[in-house]
Amino acid sequence: MSELKPAAMSVFRLAADDPMTYVQAWKDSSGGKAIALFPMNFPAEIVHAAGALPVVVQDDPTPITEGRSLLAEFYCGYTRSVADQAARGRLDVFDAFVVADHCVQLLGAVDVIRWVRPDKPMHFAQFTSAMDDAWTQPRVAGRIEDAKREVETVLGVPLTSERLARSIAVFNENRRLLRELYDLRRSGRAWITATDMQTLIKSSMVMDIQEHTRLLRGLLAGLDAPAEPREDLVRVHLSGHFCHGPRPELLDLIEETGAMVVDDDLYTGYRYIATDVPESGDPLAALSQWYLDRNRNAPCPTRVTTEIDWDTYLIDSIEASRADGVVVLMAKFCEPHMLYYPELRKALDARDIPALLLETEHEGNPIETVRTRMETFIERIRRQPAAARS
C-alpha cells in the first residue's frame, strides 16, 4: 500500500484519468487557451510563458472505434488512440497543436488531426535526432526559435526572456519535487506504488504547473514515516513505453505478484522529469541545451548521442536502485523499441540481470497470462542466491 494520502492523490488522479475534463475546466475558469503537445521532446515552458496551458496528449483507454479507418492496425496503440480521439472530437478542446517529432507513426497520427481539424494551427518543430554532430546545436536552436515565433503568433503574446526564465524556473521546481519522490522510493524511505507514481507524472503533463507544484509540496509534507522495508518483495525496475503510460491495471498486477517497483525509465515516469533546463544565460539557448541533455540523462532509442547508450544507462540505474530485475514494457508495434531491444537484452544477459519482456496493447492485454509470467519471473529471482540479488 502506498504511503501517499488518498485525499491528496484525488486531484492528481482526476487530471491524469480524465485530462480533457481538466483542460476544459481550466479554460472555463481562466479564459486562457490550451495547446496540445505530443511526446516527447517539446519544451512546455514556451507555451506556459505565453500564458496558455501546455498539455501532453495522453492515450484514451476506451476502445478505438472511428480511428480504425484512419491509421493502419500496425501503428502503435498510442498513435491509433490519438487518431481516434481526433475523429471523435475529443481533441477539440485544444486551440493548437505542437509536435517535436521522433517517430514516423506519431507523424501519421498528427496528419490525421490536420485532416480532421484543418482550422487548428499545427506546428512541426522537427528536432534533429543526431544529438552531437557539429550542426546539431545550431539546428536545434533554430527550431526552438521557430517554435517561439509560432507560439507568439498563435497566442498573440510576445515571449520575452523574462517570461521564459520564469517559466523555466517553475517547471524546474516541479521536476525537482517529483524527483524527490523518486529518490524516496529508491532509497526505501517511502513506498509509492507504480500506479501512484505514474499518476503524479501524468497529472504534471496536464495540470496547471503552479497548481501541481503547490499540491506536490503538500503531498511531500504529509508523507508518513516509512514502514519497515518489506524484505519479501522483489525490487524491480520498469523500462520502456516512450509515449504513453502503461495501463494502471498492468502496473497493479506487477506489484500484486510480489514485486515492488523501485525505479523506471518510462516516459510517464522518470524519463519525463530527468532533466532540468539551465536557469542562467539566454532562455532559448537553455531550452536548446535541455533538449540535448535529455538524451544524456535518460537515453532514448529515437535519438543518437555518441558514447551514450540506453543499455549502459539502464544497467547503471538498476545498480543504483538495487533492483533485482527489470520488466521491459514494450508497446506493440513500437519500432524504435523493437529495433533496440536485442542490444538491450544482450547487455542485460551479459550482466546476469533477470529481465522479462511484456508486450502491451491498447486493448485486449492478456492479464492472466501476464500474471502467470510475472509470478514465474518473481519466483525465478527469489531462487537466486542472496548475493546475486544485491
Regions found by a protein language model. Give the residues of each.
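Metallocofactor- and cofactor-centric catalytic cores in central/energy metabolism, strongly enriched
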Residues: S2, R13-S29, A36-M40, A44-E45, ...
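A charged, amphipathic alpha-helical module
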Residues: S2-K33, A141, E145, R149-D276
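Structural motif
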Residues: A34, D95-A96, G325
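Redox- and metal-dependent alpha/beta enzyme cores, enriched for Fe-S-associated oxidoreductases
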Residues: M40-N41, E45-Q58, H241-T306, W310-I315
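Acidic/His-rich segments in extracytoplasmic proteins that coordinate ligands and/or metal ions
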Residues: S81-T153
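Cofactor-cradling patches in redox/metallo enzymes
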Residues: V93-V112, P299-I318, L329-R345
